[in-house]
Regions:
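Glycine- and other small-residue-rich loops at beta-strand/loop junctions that grip anionic moieties
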Residues: 30, 84, 108-109
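Conserved, mostly hydrophobic/aromatic
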Residues: 21, 78, 99
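Hydrophobic faces of well-ordered beta-strands that scaffold small-molecule active sites
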Residues: 76-79, 104-108
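An N-cap/entry alpha-helix motif that binds or orients negatively charged groups
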Residues: 1-72
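A short, structure-level motif marking secondary-structure boundaries and short turns
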Residues: 26, 79-81
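N-terminal active-site wall of soluble small-molecule enzyme domains
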Residues: 64-75, 83-98
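Glycine-rich loops and low-complexity Gly/Arg-rich segments
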Residues: 52-53, 101-105
Length: 110
């Protein structure tokens, strides 16, 4: 599987599982303690249906939004994660650069 073959969350997860050493994949893919919060957050998406607007032009799609008065090009928040250098040599700097490149937010842990 290649990046160009990824079309949804499950595809990206499969690719990561193939490419990363097992301990690093499980560190990223895992959750804290007994993973109850992870399971609840994940299962909450089972109750959400995305209903497409069929026959609507998609030549110009705008994902931008405004959060706290700042316009963002993407509605994503890149959260801090410990040990990011395990999966990229530049660690948090790489995530910060990506947030800047795509004009979205990146959190810093204290």
């Amino acid at each position: 599987m290649r990046l160009k073959d990824c079309h949804n969350f499950s595809d990206f997860r499969k690719l990561a599982k193939q490419k990363l050493p097992s301990p690093i994949f499980h560190y990223i893919d895992g959750a804290a303690d007994d993973e109850i919060t992870y399971a609840r957050n994940t299962s909450a998406f089972d109750d959400v249906d995305l209903v497409p607007n069929v026959l609507r032009g998609v030549e110009s799609v705008d994902l931008s939004t405004t959060i706290f008065g700042k316009k963002l090009d993407l509605p994503f928040y890149l959260a801090p994660t410990a040990l990011q250098r395990l999966f990229h040599y530049d660690g948090e700097r790489a995530v910060g650069k990506a947030a800047q490149k795509y004009n979205t937010m990146f959190g810093v842990s204290a």
